[in-house]
Amino acid sequence: MIQEEIFNSLLETIETNKKAKEEGKVTSLLFPFERLSQKFPGWERGHYYCITAATSVGKTKLTKFLAVISVYKFIKEHPEIDYKILYFALEESREEFWLSMISSLLYEMYEITLSLAQLKSLGNYTLDDDTLTKIKQCKQWVDDMSSKVDVIDHVYNGYGIYKHVHDWHLENGSEVGGSVEEKIGKKYVPTNPNLWAFVIVDHISLLTPEKGESLYEAIGKFSKHYCLKHFVKKLNCVTIAVQQQDMTTDKQEYHQ
């Protein structure tokens, strides 16, 4: 009986997605690279992704392109769905995040390559008037994107991130059902079922451990209890953790 219920549930998912694709609806948010999309189907709701690489190889830049800029462009072409990104910037400030967006837009729109320092005319570099005019033309993009992307740069511990995400979802949905006696948890029901929620943490090696925890324990707890159990399985979020892959540094940090 249980086996039949499992199969029937799986079959329902398969048939629902097949019908949705045949009707031209979205089942995953595709990347702008055709070859990559053949190997990786894009972002799916209720999944946990980890973007990992060694120090200073562009993890944050790749994350912003694939999970912020590409998602923004994809959904612009699919107005039947909506999205919200809760981007927890543990390393950079909110200002630095949006400056990096302007830098990316300048390259995409005008093939102009500028660092954040150059955007702010630091050091020996002074921004020219023509580039400043082009920066001003990015305003509509940034204004529109910032209405969908919340950059949180003041929350550093796992529970704080969990609470922020949980509170946002309660403002945009409700919890129903549940039974203490039967040990059944409440189910989350979004107000808008066509809204895709993203939780991005960049990067989890910078999480602040709770009192008595090591960094290794804090990362494990965050991934297992908050990301997998709550964000993914309960809230159905697209959850992305950026992880620094520097084994020597990690071992030193984990054992402090």
Model-inferred region functions:
Residues 100-102, 248-256:
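Short regulatory helix/loop adjacent to the ATP-binding pocket of P-loop NTPases
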Residues 146-149, 195-198, 234-240:
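Loop/turn-to-beta-strand initiation segments
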Residues 206:
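Residues immediately C-terminal
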Residues 38, 73-193:
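Cytosolic-facing regulatory segments adjacent to core modules
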Residues 72, 218-245:
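Substrate-engagement module of ASCE P-loop NTPases
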Residues 2-110:
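The Walker A/P-loop phosphate-binding site
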Residues 150, 209-220, 252-256:
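Flexible beta-alpha connector loops of hexameric P-loop NTPases
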